[in-house]
């Protein structure tokens, strides 16, 4: 990962151990933050031609859901989902110089409950387990667990503007030592506006802030960002997405502050009623006030996603 050389040279051994642990932590947090910029997974068995769809917020990615739907039929609030994906990266360690390429595997399973309290208020509850494994740099391997809950409010008179609030408990486990290396409680608040262009494509944009509530560590940070996206249904089985986000990562310790940008293009193809194949290509640039903490990376990926609603 990045060389955190802006820290005091006189760090104790425990501080150096924390720095080493921060390497997979930053990768994990970046993946968590930008998950909405990867392929946008469907949570319904109908296409835009069959249902009225509202794009969700990046906070929904923390809860495993990517779309909120106004069902014309009886809703099915429970979802079981699983993902298997492979990615390549030209900068596995998020380094400023001396970058190293690698490939990594991501597997995720989640259980989601999404009750619709009324036409304006939708809830969501999630339990998710994720596994990250690298081909060359096994010291970057980690497991991540998320428990979350949230609400999305859709005012009837504000022209497709949605307000959302999320709580997440996030836990990262070191694969080599089989112990916990990072935990965090966070609250995310945001607003999003959707612009329907037709029944098969639309634009959306929004803003969100994530506030960390856990104990301060070298990796604890607050995140504030604006984002925009475009979604199109090319056919009843093929979808495509463009996404861009610029965010401020404000770290609790060391005076570190990063401007992080992510751009993604993605496509998804429906193989069966419940199985989807997807591909994505992401570009990330990080500009930090810390010494040797700037980096950029490219990451193409392909995967399969299974979604069962009941």
Model-derived features: where do they sit?
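Surface-exposed strand-loop-strand hairpins of Gram-negative outer-membrane beta-barrel proteins
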Residues: 75, 85-112, 135-137
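Transmembrane beta-strands of outer-membrane beta-barrel pores
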Residues: 84-92, 115, 129-133, 167-173, ...
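Residues that define the transmembrane beta-barrel architecture of outer-membrane proteins
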Residues: 101-107, 141-147, 181-187, 218-224, ...
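Outer-membrane beta-barrel channels and translocator barrels
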Residues: 73, 114-120, 154-158, 196-200, ...
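Outer-membrane beta-barrel "beta-signal"
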Residues: 269-270, 274-276, 280, 296-310
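N-terminal periplasmic/intermembrane-space "pro-region" immediately following the signal or transit peptide
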Residues: 19-79
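Outer-membrane pore/translocation modules
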Residues: 127-221
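Transmembrane beta-strands of outer-membrane beta-barrel proteins
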Residues: 78-82, 107, 123-125, 161-165, ...
